[in-house]
């Protein structure tokens, strides 16, 4: 019936418009009152108002919490249900704060260096703590590792999830970035072992007016450094190796700020570690002499893996290691089983130190890894002698420090006749190489300490090595 009425033509067209009933006027709106909305509109408005009223919780970075002093963290914990906050260590307090912030709905992120724990999971360690195990380390599950083909030593940033009742660590929910590349754009690189090794070709000049120029100028003339060098600083006790290594670090940082410089100190005195951290603008990873040997092995493993990942990215990396002897001692003490060889070394004790040192190389695909390591001699230890003999022929650069020169207070105490670089002609241009060979022949005609003293006197009279090579020895 309704359809029939709707389809019937309206008679309004035949009736004058003025005779039609006028529409009722709209009701007047009372001032200050809004017209009533439909129930659906009311519900929609209410939802929008709730969304607008909901507070936006700020993103929290665990790395920023780690930088803050303990007093600040304790103040943050005052309004949170954290038991005995005043008695917790800084790392424990960071863990508890992260746990509470996640429970409140904050987005919590953190970055760290990946260390493989077992086949199905890994941990993100804090580089600032030299990769020491800590309560605020981050658990990284296999479900995040396998899809992206993540590797040990990579810098990874993750987003954390709320903790479950039996969780012992803060746990990653998703990967945000790998080596500062967004996770969705990241692609696995060629493995370090598959890259093509080459001779060092590009020079690392150490001469710099801002540091001990004399020592660095001697090294540039007698033992030139190249990117991808594998060098040994062979030193007796109190021969000045630590000071020389520190000066090399400062020169590289001043001349090549783009180079990834890493300092690794093993079995070292705590005050020496602090001195390096304060005077060298580079990450310092250390394991002091009061820590167990397995700790020496752990930090060295992570440092070399971190360096390999950087080389895979095409970076130039320099590792300064003090010392290779202590690294070998640490692996030897950490070894279980096997035969005992000469000097008390285990049959397989030098396998990992050898792999560490042999990783130094220039790479055809781009990037390089340079390792300059100190090696102890004249310590009256048979083990140290065996370690030195094992590594003696593996490097392509050797700097020999002389005890007689150091006793005469001649620094740097470098033995000119016993120091040198293999294939150094690749690092000099032709004219420079001719001048260098003339200089070395002149110095070789003098006794050891007289030759070095003559060179240092000529260095003090010239502004730079270029001037010295042009004028010759005086």
From Swiss-Prot:
Homohexamer. The homohexamer assembles into an open ring structure. Residues 107-182 form the Rho RNA-BD domain. NCBIfam families: PRK09376.1 (NF006886). PANTHER family: TRANSCRIPTION TERMINATION FACTOR RHO. One of its GO terms (biological process) is DNA-templated transcription termination. Gene3D superfamilies: Nucleic acid-binding proteins, P-loop containing nucleotide triphosphate hydrolases. One of its GO terms (molecular function) is ATP hydrolysis activity. InterPro entries: AAA+_ATPase, ATPase_F1/V1/A1_a/bsu_nucl-bd, NA-bd_OB-fold, P-loop_NTPase, Rho-like_N, Rho_factor_ATP-bd, Rho_N_sf, Rho_RNA-bd. It is an enzyme of class 3 (hydrolase). ATP binds at residues 226-231, 238-243, 269. Its EC number is 3.6.4.-. Keywords: ATP-binding, Helicase, Hydrolase, Nucleotide-binding, RNA-binding, Transcription, Transcription regulation, Transcription termination. This is Transcription termination factor Rho. Residues 1-60 are annotated as: Disordered. PROSITE patterns: RHO_RNA_BD. Facilitates transcription termination by a mechanism that involves Rho binding to the nascent RNA, activation of Rho's RNA-dependent ATPase activity, and release of the mRNA from the DNA template. The keyword Hydrolase applies. Belongs to the Rho family.
């Amino acid at each position: 019936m309704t359809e029939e009425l709707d389809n019937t033509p309206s008679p309004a067209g035949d009736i004058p418009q003025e005779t039609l009933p006028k529409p009722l006027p709209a009701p007047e709106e009372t001032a200050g009152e809004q017209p009533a909305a439909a129930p659906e509109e009311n519900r929609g408005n209410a939802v929008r108002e709730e969304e607008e009223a909901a507070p936006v919780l700020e993103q929290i970075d665990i790395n920023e919490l780690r930088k803050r002093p303990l007093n600040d963290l304790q103040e943050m914990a005052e309004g949170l249900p954290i038991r005995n906050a005043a008695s917790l260590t800084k790392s424990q307090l960071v863990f508890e704060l992260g746990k509470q912030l996640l429970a409140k709905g904050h987005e919590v992120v953190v970055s760290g260096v990946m260390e493989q724990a077992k086949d199905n999971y890994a941990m993100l360690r804090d580089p600032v703590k030299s990769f020491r195990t800590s309560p605020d380390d981050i658990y990284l599950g296999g479900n995040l590792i396998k899809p992206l083909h993540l590797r040990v030593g990579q810098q990874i940033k993750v987003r954390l999830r709320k903790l479950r009742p039996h969780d012992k660590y803060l746990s990653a929910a998703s990967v945000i970035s790998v080596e500062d590349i967004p996770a969705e754009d990241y692609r696995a690189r060629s493995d370090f072992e598959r890259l093509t090794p080459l001779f060092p070709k590009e020079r690392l000049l150490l001469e710099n007016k801002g540091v001990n120029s004399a020592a660095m100028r001697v090294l540039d003339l007698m033992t030139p450094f190249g990117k991808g060098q594998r060098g040994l600083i062979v030193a007796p006790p109190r021969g000045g190796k630590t000071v020389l290594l520190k000066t090399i670090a400062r020169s590289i940082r001043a001349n090549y700020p783009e180079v990834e410089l890493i300092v690794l100190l093993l079995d070292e005195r705590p005050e020496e570690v602090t001195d390096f951290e304060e005077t060298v603008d580079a990450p310092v990873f250390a394991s002091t002499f009061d820590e167990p040997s397995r700790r020496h092995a752990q930090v060295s493993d992570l440092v070399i893996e971190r360096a390999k990942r950087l080389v895979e990215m095409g970076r130039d990396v320099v590792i300064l290691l003090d010392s290779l002897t202590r690294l070998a001692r640490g692996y030897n003490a950490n070894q279980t089983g096997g035969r005992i060889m000469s000097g008390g070394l285990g049959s397989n004790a030098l396998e990992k130190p050898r792999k560490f040192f042999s990783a130094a190389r220039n790479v055809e695909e781009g990037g390089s890894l340079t390792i300059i390591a100190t090696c102890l001699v004249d310590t009256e230890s048979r083990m140290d002698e065996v370690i030195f003999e094992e590594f003696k022929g593996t490097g392509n650069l050797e700097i020999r420090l002389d005890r007689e020169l150091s006793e005469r207070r001649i620094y740097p105490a470098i033995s000119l006749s016993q120091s040198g670089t293999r294939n150094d002609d690749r690092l000099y241009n032709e004219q420079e190489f001719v001048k260098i060979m003339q200089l070395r022949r002149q110095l070789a005609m003098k006794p050891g300490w007289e030759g070095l003293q003559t060179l240092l006197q000529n260095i003090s009279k010239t502004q730079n090595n270029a001037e010295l090579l042009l004028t010759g020895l005086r």
